[in-house]
Amino acid sequence: GAKHVILRYPDLYRRHQVAWGPYTNYITQDIRRIMNYRNWSKIVTNNPDGEYGHQHHKKTDELVTAVSHENAEHYDKLYYFEKFYTQDAIPEGLAKLPSDVAQKKHALIFKNYFDRGAIRMYEYFNDYENWVKATDWQ
């Protein structure tokens, strides 16, 4: 079975962000189908801030969170990506991921994400970005 699922909805078209408004119902149906496909141990998505404010990350969080609220078991398994910090604002003492987890994360990022510019721009935070249970998000 699948260890993870990454939806590939369009982000950019000819260097302009694609508006997801017309596709929201389709995206929601896909999220619902995936959540109900199997008994996932965790459901992990973008945080409500969209990490660094990306409109599609915010929308993804909104939709995944809304669908997870339809089933208490799903919501109990919902996690968000850690609060995002700029390179000069990482709090002192913010825990880094264990090295084996960080290595797996780096491999997953390079395998699944095509925006190499964004990968390079935010790479400094990869070793810190853990998951936060949705009920603990502040």
Where in the sequence are the language-model features?
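Active-site beta-strand->loop->alpha-helix modules in alpha/beta enzyme cores, enriched
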Residues: 1-74
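The feature marks non-catalytic terminal segments
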Residues: 73-138
